[in-house]
Amino acid sequence: MSSQAFTSVHPNAATSDVNVTIDTFVAKLKRRQVQGSYAIALETLQLLMRFISAARWNHVNDLIEQIRDLGNSLEKAHPTAFSCGNVIRRILAVLRDEVEEDTMSTTVTSTSVAEPLISSMFNLLQKPEQPHQNRKNSSGSSSMKTKTDYRQVAIQGIKDLIDEIKNIDEGIQQIAIDLIHDHEILLTPTPDSKTVLKFLITARERSNRTFTVLVTEGFPNNTKNAHEFAKKLAQHNIETLVVPDSAVFALMSRVGKVIIGTKAVFVNGGTISSNSGVSSVCECAREFRTPVFAVAGLYKLSPLYPFDVEKFVEFGGSQRILPRMDPRKRLDTVNQITDYVPPENIDIYITNVGGFNPSFIYRIAWDNYKQIDVHLDKNKA
């Protein structure tokens, strides 16, 4: 999306430098040059901070619409980068809460001024004072400080969210000590998840417990990540085995827990994993009554509902599965990169604020988002 296209919507939205930054980030999202929910969320917040600092508006609703337009542009650039839209919705919720709080306080103040208490019979004979002049002066001073106040509220909300994301692993790692037992066999089908990696390392170092981790190779897209994941665990004296995807069913009877990483968590309790084949592993665990724990930070919680699952699942090139062939040979090859896991195949979500059942995820989502901001696109809202 060009800077001219974005500026035409709001010509005074930001300076040219910010528009160039927006175009650069949009291009990086389209080319998939930014990988991982963590990196995308932090870069989006840094961009949003620059955007709000340079934004111009007459009313706070104008600022909210500008932020929504920016979020819509980023979501269209990378529709499956859910953390990008999630953090923008979090800041919108902060602004809307502040607007609602200011509106309520203004209403209470005007009511108390307009309707003074009559304390004695003598006051009944007096002409009440007209507070219109005072209200005019107060509203004038309020309008003068509105821009500065809401700008600071949004920037402070962004800083708080950045701190939350950077320290999100600490809250999750505290649960690892109580969750993993000694001499237990664990299985993880998401070797590219840094949160799962820190989760297992923390359980080994802080509790000094001995356990074995089985890592599925994730052929064909994550085989290299699986071996690197196993190598990092072995460096912390954790016994690790890389197993073929086809051996999961045979090994599941020995597994005590399945731990998966997430890319996005929807309000129905379902999740998008960053590796294909995770859904089959969770389905197998359900048949063997093996508990499945999904590790996710709050910034991965999305207010969207997966009505069309195929729209949220990514597909890659077929060159990893089959070599290049004669185009005249009609053969359709599917290389699924991500996977959707339904809520019935997940037992507990482990977040930085505690563990929750999938059926309770919707309540946590609505504590952080507003219903009006579920769809940033005006045509869908």
Curated annotation (Swiss-Prot):
SUPFAM superfamilies: NagB/RpiA/CoA transferase-like. Residues 125-148 are annotated as: Disordered. GO terms for molecular function: enzyme regulator activity; translation initiation factor activity. InterPro entries: eIF2B_beta_subunit, IF-2B-related, IF_2B-like_C, M1Pi_N, NagB/RpiA_transferase-like. Keywords: Cytoplasm, Initiation factor, Protein biosynthesis, Translation regulation. One of its GO terms (biological process) is translational initiation. One of its GO terms (cellular component) is eukaryotic translation initiation factor 2B complex. Residues 136-145 have a biased composition (Polar residues). The keyword Transmembrane does not apply. It is found in: Cytoplasm, Cytosol. Pfam families: IF-2B. The keyword Protein biosynthesis applies. It comes from the Eukaryota. Present with 6650 molecules/cell in log phase SD medium. Component of the translation initiation factor 2B (eIF2B) complex which is a heterodecamer of two sets of five different subunits: alpha, beta, gamma, delta and epsilon. Subunits alpha, beta and delta comprise a regulatory subcomplex and subunits epsilon and gamma comprise a catalytic subcomplex. Within the complex, the hexameric regulatory complex resides at the center, with the two heterodimeric catalytic subcomplexes bound on opposite sides. Belongs to the eIF-2B alpha/beta/delta subunits family. PANTHER family: TRANSLATION INITIATION FACTOR EIF-2B SUBUNIT BETA (PTHR45859:SF1). Acts as a component of the translation initiation factor 2B (eIF2B) complex, which catalyzes the exchange of GDP for GTP on the eukaryotic initiation factor 2 (eIF2) complex gamma subunit. Its guanine nucleotide exchange factor activity is repressed when bound to eIF2 complex phosphorylated on the alpha subunit, thereby limiting the amount of methionyl-initiator methionine tRNA available to the ribosome and consequently global translation is repressed. This is Translation initiation factor eIF2B subunit beta. The gene is GCD7.
